[in-house]
Amino acid sequence: MAEKISPGMQQYLDIKQDYPDAFLLFRMGDFYELFYEDAVNAAQILELTLTSRNKNSENPIPMAGVPHHAATEYIDKLVDLGYKVAVAEQMEDPKKAVGIVKRAVTQVITPGTTIDTANSVDNNFLVAIDFKAKRYALSYMDLSTGEFKVTELSEFSAVVGEIASLKAREIVVGFPLDEAQVKVFERQMNLLISEQFEIPENLLIELSGLTALENQAASKLLAYVKETQMRDLSHLQEVEHYEIKDFLQMDFATKSSLELTANKRENKKHGTLYWLLDETKTAMGTRMLRSWIDRPLVSNSAIQKRMEIVQVFLDHFFERSDLIEALKGVYDLERLASRVSFGKAVPVDFLQLANSLSNVPAIKNILEVLDEMPLNELRSQLDEIPELSGLINSAISENASRTITEGGIIKKGYNVQLDKYREALENGTSWIAKLEADEKAKTGISTLRIDYNRKDGYYFHITQSQLNSVPEHFYRKATLKNSERFGSQELTEIEEIMLEAREKSSSLEYDLFMGLRAETEQYIGRLQALAKTIAEIDCLQSLSVVAEKQGYIRPTLTEGSRIVEIKGGRHAVVEAVMGAQEYVPNDIELPEQTDIQLITGPNMSGKSTYMRQFALTVIMAQIGSFVPAETANLPIFDAIFTRIGASDNLISGESTFMVEMSEANHAIQKATSRSLIIFDELGRGTATYDGMALAQAIIEYVHEHIGAKTLFATHYHELTDLDKELDHLDNVHVATLEQNGNVTFLHKITDGPADKSYGIHVAKIAGLPQTLLERADLILQKLENKPLPAKKVADEQEQLSLFDFAENSSEIIEKIKGQNVDNMTAREALNFLWELKDSL
């Protein structure tokens, strides 16, 4: 016979049935309890004590719990690990409940919807995607700031890249995923996948500026958030359309290899461009700076607008210093506005709002003193919101606690009735003191005192030795080992007045605070607009501080130009780490007629640094930053493509060579004549001749069909002869100094090809044994004196091009065109290559 389930456990099971994919925290008194499998798993993850309910029954129910006051800490840990948490609250006072206490889930917290994050700086983006007619829509929002955007994309690879750039932890899908897509999201990107296929009619977004698919994706994202948060989301901004092409396009591999916002070793900020440029003083400014680095501009007018303000701040040191001090007093307005909207704002949040608003007049005044045209628009957007600051300053006490139940929140003079209750409490305290003094005098008991606790209320404390002097109008309340507690009619009357005043005072203060919170909601839009303006000012002052500190110059950007001319250029991050004295600057020149720069030279000589230096300089210029150079004339690039380093994707089964070819293919397919391509040692992941042949073919293809500015570093010295065949290719190399058998890398880029590779010298620097190095040198001499193998191209032969196709080339081309390479697995791609090889 099955054991009977208690009403409480039945209530738990009924609620759990609606949230099978979440840990259910079930409020019971002062604890949140977990049961069954949730309890077992949570006990292990959170290191909780696993106990059981109905221990003496045949099948005790596993149980674990956390104190309600510490629940946020445990919830955050579960969410950080990628789990969902459903919180079921008591919906009525247990003392007043008839039968079982009513409970209901009030919020589902997920990796993409948490707003109480310990890291108050980084965004926490929740992404939704939808699909129709071979097109994808991607919408994202940050619940903690209210940001809400959407775009449409043509390829799944672009969707993946955008999600990776956003550093999302959860994705809401509006259509059934196939197995390959699930694998990408779950295994490779470690995303929590949630589903939202339906859109409630009242949540359907139909904005004219969005496509039908964009409206659909944004609606499904909004529906998911409403379903999980179960509250008003007044802080959410109207969904905004954006286009990838409106920014300098870089895929995630490029951003990663250039270490723009996260270093490759630890996936942290230190040693990145973000780390270097971040002299921001506000949380909003820090987030905005990261987004600027992630999405550089392609509009020259927008770039120049930023640079002009950076120049103004650079030219006015003292005003900038005052501005920085004012910015330091501004708290995270975006997150504070969100906490108000979510009903989670506590008294200290309002004090931070008031303090932030009190600094706005100072910021505005500094911009007025500067009186520069570029600052006019920003100055006009600085809304002091005097109504809100006045409301908070009149209502909230400067010494208010973090909680809304401890009292002392509302200022004296804000509410007449509250002041009366407080006066009664103060009078009661003086009445107690007077009564204590009177009874001491009447009874002659010098040690008599009036104390208070929750159980006995107010009482007279009398020690054992003085009990003979207790007056008749005292009555016993409690007996202790060495003393007794007594009451009196007068003390009871005073206590009743004080308790009533305390209860009514606490209740009224709570109501007044909740009213203030509700009234503040009407200012959320203005707070968010103010936050955006302050963030922009903060970013621009940050760029000016870095420019001054590092000795950067304002670059010249020319729309439509194809000339690159950088004098004394440096790698911004390497210089910051090493120090300017140690860094060797280099010129970078790609005149109108030069598209490709073929770079040769030994390992460790600085080829990769030189190429990264160029890419970072372009990115810095196009976010509106000054750049590390003596002079810099640049075109405006539409995209940057890189293949740098051996970033094997072993998790997905892709080798170095497959990754090389995939990234090269991405550049070849997407680059335009306005793009920048950087290839570092392309082809080294396969056999020498295969690699060399592919490298040459790719160079030829870029030269003949794309015309993008390209830096191509290689160890294949045979490729340097291409300058005789390709009009728009120049050779450069990293200079070395060879003296008495020792080689010094000068880290200086010089015209012409390198004449040696110095591989043995690099091995010597790495510390290989001397006998091994001597043997390698002997083998090298033999190889250099050995006749060239027949396989090698003879001097008199024409240099081969991989784009001279076989007779059946049209058939092969049609086969290639029929493949969707973005959705092919590594195995499928290799099988297809073998099939093509067999058909040649």
From Swiss-Prot:
Per UniProt, ATP binds at G601, P602, N603, M604, S605, G606, K607, S608
**Which BP terms in the Gene Ontology apply to this protein?**
mismatch repair
For this protein, the record's SUPFAM superfamilies field holds: DNA repair protein MutS, domain I (SSF55271), DNA repair protein MutS, domain II (SSF53150), DNA repair protein MutS, domain III (SSF48334), P-loop containing nucleoside triphosphate hydrolases (SSF52540)
Q: Which domain of life is it from?
A: Bacteria
Annotated GO molecular function terms are: ATP binding; ATP-dependent DNA damage sensor activity; damaged DNA binding; mismatched DNA binding
**Entry function:** This protein is involved in the repair of mismatches in DNA. It is possible that it carries out the mismatch recognition step. This protein has a weak ATPase activity.
Family, per entry: Belongs to the DNA mismatch repair MutS family.
**Any idea what this protein is called?**
DNA mismatch repair protein MutS
Q: Which gene encodes it?
A: mutS
